[in-house]
């Protein structure tokens, strides 16, 4: 760039900073803290599928799926992980269905959890905005988008038509929230429900409620489905669950996590460790027997899980090895790619 352009740019940058404050414009490389902070989902398989070790702070996340698929359980697991890291969390219970006893069983400190049961959708979103602007809250969960009822609909009659009211309300909220959440480094998780589109002949007839704004503004979208039942004899004790990363702005999307949700316990972490350990050859499997470092840990997955519960040091060791092997900080892939490019360049120059 020639000197005149350089001077003009410096003057423009100076004027912008004077008018809007320091840091209102900068060169992207000047920002040294480019690593994205994440919060674990409580499931190692899902953390790996997300590529960054968890859900990103300062972003909007959408979790959707059919009824009783584990949406609220997943968010309560995220809250428990965030609280363990010393973060302040809030739960906006628009469905008026939060069970404090179940939340406690999943490891949530209910004495420290902020909870609101708003009367209208506008009130719920104003509370979210106020909490984000305070800068004191690190994680907000809204359960659910479908239950965010506009004030006009609540005050109207049963048969009244309110076309697009909820979508307009959410669209405005997304525009206001995105910047405030980023500035406060606060994550907002929206739980959503599934509806069927009428008259769809080809393609997927499923859609989520609340219009398209949330789909655009969300950095991560997770589709959670129940794929089967876990039985102990004749008794059903949990669900086989598949979670698909439908959208991901912080790593590669479309990865899937297969996990188990046990009733009253949450994710079957030890089961995940065994499955991932076998897949990545840290745990050996011979017939029905599982062994680690040559020592048998159990016959069958259930007995192996019990062994890991009784020996948490082994479970921690396997988890650490898996995290070191499968998770790299966001941005490391870019650095590796740059190193490869430089190596190719050097090789080409050497050949000349």
From Swiss-Prot:
InterPro entries: AAA+_ATPase, DNA_recomb/repair_RecA, DNA_recomb/repair_RecA_CS, P-loop_NTPase, RecA-like_C, RecA-like_N, RecA_ATP-bd, RecA_C_sf. It is found in: Cytoplasm. Gene3D superfamilies: P-loop containing nucleotide triphosphate hydrolases (3.40.50.300). Residues 333-352 have a biased composition (Basic and acidic residues). Residues 332-352 are annotated as: Disordered. ATP binds at residues 65-72. Signal peptide: none annotated. One of its GO terms (cellular component) is cytosol. Keywords: ATP-binding, Cytoplasm, DNA damage, DNA recombination, DNA repair, DNA-binding, Nucleotide-binding, SOS response. GO terms for molecular function: ATP binding; ATP hydrolysis activity; ATP-dependent DNA damage sensor activity; damaged DNA binding; single-stranded DNA binding. One of its GO terms (biological process) is SOS response. HAMAP family: RecA. Belongs to the RecA family. Can catalyze the hydrolysis of ATP in the presence of single-stranded DNA, the ATP-dependent uptake of single-stranded DNA by duplex DNA, and the ATP-dependent hybridization of homologous single-stranded DNAs. It interacts with LexA causing its activation and leading to its autocatalytic cleavage. This is Protein RecA.
């Amino acid at each position: 760039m020639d000197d005149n352009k350089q001077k003009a740019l410096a003057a423009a940058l100076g004027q912008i900073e004077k008018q809007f404050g320091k840091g209102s414009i900068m060169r992207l490389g000047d920002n040294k803290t480019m690593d994205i902070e994440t919060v674990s989902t409580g499931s190692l398989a899902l953390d790996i599928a997300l590529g960054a070790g968890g859900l990103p702070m300062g972003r909007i996340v959408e979790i959707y799926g059919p009824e009783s698929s584990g949406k609220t359980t997943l968010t309560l697991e995220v809250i428990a992980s965030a609280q363990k890291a010393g973060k302040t969390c809030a739960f906006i219970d628009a469905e008026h269905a939060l069970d404090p006893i179940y939340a406690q069983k999943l490891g949530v400190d209910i004495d420290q959890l902020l909870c609101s049961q708003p009367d209208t959708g506008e009130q719920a979103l104003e509370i979210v905005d106020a909490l984000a602007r305070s800068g004191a809250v690190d994680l907000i969960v809204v359960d659910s988008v479908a239950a965010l009822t506009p004030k006009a609909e609540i005050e109207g009659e049963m048969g009244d038509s309110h076309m697009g009211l909820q979508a307009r309300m959410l669209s405005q909220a997304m525009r206001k929230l995105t910047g405030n959440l980023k500035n406060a480094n606060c994550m907002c998780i929206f739980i959503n429900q599934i509806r069927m589109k009428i008259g769809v002949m080809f393609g997927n007839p499923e859609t989520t409620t609340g219009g398209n704004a949330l789909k655009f503004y969300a950095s991560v979208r997770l589709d959670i489905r129940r794929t089967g039942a876990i039985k102990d004899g004749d008794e059903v004790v949990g669900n086989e669950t598949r979670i698909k990363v439908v959208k991901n702005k912080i790593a590669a999307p479309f990865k899937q996590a297969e996990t188990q949700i046990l009733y009253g316990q949450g994710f079957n972490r030890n089961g995940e460790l065994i499955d991932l350990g076998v897949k990545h050859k840290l745990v050996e499997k011979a017939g029905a027997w599982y062994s680690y470092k040559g020592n048998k840990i159990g016959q069958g997955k259930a007995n192996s899980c019990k062994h890991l519960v009784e020996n948490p040091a082994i479970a921690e060791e396997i988890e650490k090895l898996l995290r070191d092997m499968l998770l790299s900080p966001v941005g490391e892939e870019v650095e590796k790619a740059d190193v490869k490019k430089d190596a190719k360049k050097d090789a080409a120059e050497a050949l000349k």
